[in-house]
């Protein structure tokens, strides 16, 4: 079966988050995000939002969701209190239409922090 052309694929948004927690894995981040989305919006809402963690490195991670559900996703991220058994806070840094655009938020954030 051939893949769908780009015009027929579902559009997605990528949210760059800063993870303020101890040492946690990408799997722990996904579980915390999925549980938070399910708790806030139920199974039907979670199926509409399609949460996924596509990248994590150090204190940053990129979470994917369906276009049009960015606000619900950021609300769910703000409600996370635990990840991997330890206290955690997920702070939204940037929302973008591509992974590369979301990653650019890391360098911009660091540039502003180091200008002092």
Residue ranges and their predicted role:
Residues 2-6:
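Short beta-strand/turn micro-motifs at beta-sheet edges
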Residues 80-116:
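Long, charge-dense
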Residues 64-71:
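Helix N-cap motif at beta-to-alpha junctions
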Residues 55-62:
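The conserved glycine-aromatic submotif of the RRM
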Residues 73-80:
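Short amphipathic alpha-helices in soluble, non-transmembrane regions
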Residues 9-54, 93, 102, 106, ...:
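Surface-exposed, low-hydrophobicity interaction/linker segments
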Residues 18, 62-64, 91:
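Beta-strand cores of modular interaction/reader domains in eukaryotic scaffold and signaling proteins
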Residues 12-14, 60, 87-89:
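Broad gene-expression machinery/nucleic-acid interaction feature
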């Amino acid at each position: 079966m051939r893949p769908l052309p780009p015009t027929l694929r579902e559009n997605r948004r990528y949210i760059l988050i800063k993870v303020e927690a101890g040492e946690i894995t990408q799997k722990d981040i996904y579980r915390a995000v999925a549980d938070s989305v399910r708790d806030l919006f139920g199974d039907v809402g979670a199926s509409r939002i399609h949460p996924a963690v596509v990248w994590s490195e150090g204190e940053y991670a990129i979470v994917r969701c369906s276009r049009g559900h960015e606000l619900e996703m950021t609300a769910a991220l703000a409600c996370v209190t635990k990840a991997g058994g330890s206290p955690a806070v997920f702070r939204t840094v940037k929302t973008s239409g591509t992974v590369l655009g979301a990653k650019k938020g890391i360098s911009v954030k660091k540039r502003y922090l180091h200008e002092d």
